[in-house]
């Protein structure tokens, strides 16, 4: 992981063109080759980014006499020929660190069992639902459950024991990525938990994500009437 806080401008050249004027930003270069540009807002969302596989070349800019002027041009290019051209005027801070292989999110026993049970009884989410697979792999981690509704539309399900805002944000990231896949989109989201905090429910509904309150005992086959769908 390489983190660079720098004064820079950014130009995207590809299917369309976009420009970010000169300003202080965070440049994040990950070991997988991805590069993203962040401002001090927008939560986790970058201003612009390039996903792997891509290449990064850094070249000093020179004047007409061939002398370096203290400015560097970063060119990030993917296989399609799309480019991020980052003009780095000044680096304020730079840090590189090998984070190693991340073990990923580890669910507690109840969450893992909820996922297993919901996959077995996927029609809990609605009549006509069918399971695609558990732990559907993506570039940013596995989606708990990927399924299809009665109309054949793709649905991504995030399962939590206690549903809070972090879980909604996590599902939102999955949806943003999955909806770029021509074979899957449009992808809807379901946030499922034994208990969903009011703030999380409000955020989910604002983003068009359906909330499902799960009764663990019902899914285990024990009589209960507390399963509620929203």
Curated annotation (Swiss-Prot):
N-terminal signal peptide: none
InterPro entries the record matches: Endonuclease_NucS (IPR002793), NucS_C (IPR048301), NucS_N (IPR048302), NucS_N_sf (IPR049173), Restrct_endonuc-II-like (IPR011335), tRNA_endonuc-like_dom_sf (IPR011856)
One annotated Gene Ontology cellular component of this protein: cytoplasm
Pfam families: NucS_C, NucS_N
Places the protein is found: Cytoplasm
EC class name: hydrolase
Example GO molecular function: DNA binding
Gene3D superfamilies named in the record: 2.70.180.20, 3.40.1350.10
Transmembrane segments: none
Keywords linked to the UniProt accession: Cytoplasm, DNA-binding, Endonuclease, Hydrolase, Nuclease
Main location per the UniProt record: cytoplasm
EC number in record: 3.1.-.-
Family to which this protein belongs: Belongs to the NucS endonuclease family.
NCBIfam families: PRK03298.1
Function: Cleaves both 3' and 5' ssDNA extremities of branched DNA structures.
Name of the featured protein: Endonuclease NucS
Species assigned in the record: Corynebacterium efficiens (strain DSM 44549 / YS-314 / AJ 12310 / JCM 11189 / NBRC 100395)
This protein's encoding gene: nucS
């Amino acid at each position: 992981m390489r983190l660079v806080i720098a004064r820079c401008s950014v130009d995207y050249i590809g299917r369309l063109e976009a420009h970010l004027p000169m300003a202080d930003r965070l440049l994040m270069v990950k070991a997988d080759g991805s590069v993203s540009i962040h401002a001090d807002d927008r939560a986790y969302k970058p201003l612009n980014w390039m996903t792997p596989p891509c290449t990064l070349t850094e070249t000093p800019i020179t004047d007409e006499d061939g002398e370096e002027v203290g400015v560097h041009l970063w060119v990030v290019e993917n296989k399609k020929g799309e480019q991020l051209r980052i003009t780095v005027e000044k680096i304020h801070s730079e840090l590189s660190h090998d984070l190693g292989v991340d073990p990923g999110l580890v669910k507690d026993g109840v969450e893992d069992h909820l996922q297993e049970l919901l996959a077995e009884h996927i029609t809990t989410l609605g009549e006509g639902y069918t399971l695609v697979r558990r732990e559907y792999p993506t570039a940013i981690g596995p989606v708990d459950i990927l399924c299809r509704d009665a109309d054949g539309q793709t649905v991504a399900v995030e399962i939590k024991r206690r549903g809070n805002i972090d879980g909604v944000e996590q599902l939102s990231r999955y949806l943003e990525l999955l909806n770029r896949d021509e074979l899957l989109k449009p992808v809807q989201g379901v946030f499922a938990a034994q208990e969903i905090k009011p703030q999380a429910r409000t955020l989910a509904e604002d983003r068009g994500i359906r909330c499902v309150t799960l009764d663990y005992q019902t899914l285990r086959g024990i009589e209960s009437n507390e399963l509620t769908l929203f």
